[in-house]
Amino acid sequence: MISIPKTLKQAALPVLMLLMGPGVARADMCNAKFFHDGGIIEIAGSGIFSINAKMAFSQVKKSNAEVCQAKVRGFANYSLMGMFTGANELDHLMLINGSKSSLTKIAPGKSPDAATFDLRMLNIFGYGAPIQSAGQRFPAQSFRLDLGDPSQATTPLTVRTGEKTVGARQSIQTALGQQSCWPVRYARNTDATVANLRGITIPVPPIQSQITDWFCPQANLVMKQEVEHAGQRGVIEVKSVK
């Protein structure tokens, strides 16, 4: 395992976050259990990467049931592909207006850099529109993020998620108890590239994964994400919601 110095933390974490997929808020997110001053979401996962993260909500303002905002702060400790380890602080502004949302990195005196960190890639907040029935589809997406030491030349990493397909609703066990949740299945792939780590060029192989998100309407969250990569399985779960 390689411990990443501080200059690499912001560059390595997006790779982990992009594996979790992009997401935006649902229209009823303003009334979610966690959307209040002092609200907390904790997640943990293992597999091709492991993660422990905590997000805290503060300065919550609600204009009505569909328009609200909050500061989202916290931290994430992670290990990716057995090569990258590190920790990052989370500091974002979350704005919700109906079925749309935005998450902006807070960086006083600097321009927010979505390529180095973007909390939207956690995907736990859903797909931007309510799930109505099995067979419903959400469009494919692609992203381009910088990989490598930001103090040196970086390499763009392309990530593609295939079309998402909703399966039949099922009852699953979650940290909030038994819930009726929608499975949302899709492929997620990254292209092969190279990254500069402490002045050493390291090849990064392509990553091809099959994903199943379990979106639970009662919680307004993807409470569990199952990841299959090269015959190995991993799980990312919401462990606590307050």
What are these regions (language model features)?
Residues D28-A107, L147-K242:
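Acidic, serine/threonine-rich low-complexity disordered tracts
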